[in-house]
Swiss-Prot record:
F-type ATPases have 2 components, CF(1) - the catalytic core - and CF(0) - the membrane proton channel. CF(1) has five subunits: alpha(3), beta(3), gamma(1), delta(1), epsilon(1). CF(0) has three main subunits: a, b and c. One of its GO terms (cellular component) is plasma membrane. It comes from Psychrobacter sp. (strain PRwf-1). It comes from the Bacteria. Belongs to the ATPase epsilon chain family. This is ATP synthase epsilon chain. Keywords: ATP synthesis, Cell inner membrane, Cell membrane, CF(1), Hydrogen ion transport, Ion transport, Membrane, Transport.
Amino acid sequence: MATLQCRVVSAREEIYAGEISMLIATGSEGEVGILAGHTPLITLLKPGSMRIQTPDGNEEVIYVSGGVLEVQPKLVTVLADTAVRAHDLDEAKIVEARKKAEQMLANQTETLQTNAALASLAESVAQLQTIRKYRNRA
């Protein structure tokens, strides 16, 4: 199978660099799969899991909180706001953050608080979905 190079970079660090056979992520228009030879593309990423398949058949699952996906003829670059390998996500902390966001929504008094709570809730849900996808593959 044909391959291409991939780099996943967050504001803090490079999460992944290497050869891949496929990448699947959630873009602004829905789920997108990238294989070697894909047409050039730039799209915004939505919060959620991103799957990287390596040429040897292994799969990496990475949570991204948003960012940009750029596809060039031989290179895929992901510039993520936040990127964390699924096995590094702390489920207990995420569940606690989700509960806190739900409580904030229940006790809302201002639109700004509502927006912050909704954003926090969406991030927690996306992280939990990433953990579940990772567990199903492990």
